[in-house]
Amino acid sequence: TSAQWMINLMLAQKGGNYLDADGNVNITSDEMIEVLTYIKEMQDTGAFATIPGGQPDNEEAYPFYNSGDYAAQIMPFWQTSRYTNYMTDLKGKVAIAAVPAFEGSVVQTIGGGGTGTAVVASGEHADLAAEVMAYIKLSAEASKEIWNVLGFDPVNTEVWTDTELTQNPDNQFVQYFTTYPFDVLNEVKDSIGLLTCFTDEKMPSINNEF
């Protein structure tokens, strides 16, 4: 319950943000009220439920997916590795699909962290570190291994259409899921948005509110 992946997504679909026009933290906006009201109503009908452990990537949650108590989750792409590592019984039974969107939404999905990585500007070799970081995050070579090893969606979207990579029958993630994961990414590629507050220094304060 301390993670807001689904709330972030729905808020972006509504065109909202956690900051107001003046850059102040605002978690009571009209868009946020609409999102939380929708979630509560879905919970009241029994369609939504909080997973044991509070969020889908906690170890307490995995047995309940394995047993079929929960049919779906809305999570960032890095969750693929949790399936291959912790929910092996579900191999060949899980599909990756585009998330539902509110009618009229320009944004269908957003990027969701995840653990951030930064280069300290005051470091002795900050420029070199930045070059290395850019290579391992953005180059085609590194992007392919980000998918092959970690199961993450690479930031470099050029590799998304490389079917030798994305449909490789020897890839553990291609073998696990019943759909080609990158087919979904390419389907929503032009409607990926973001919450601008993600890069704001106030983001930790927003997390504290929840």
What are the residue ranges of the model-derived segments?
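Glycine-centered hinge/linker elements that transmit conformational signals in sensory
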Residues: N24-G54, V99
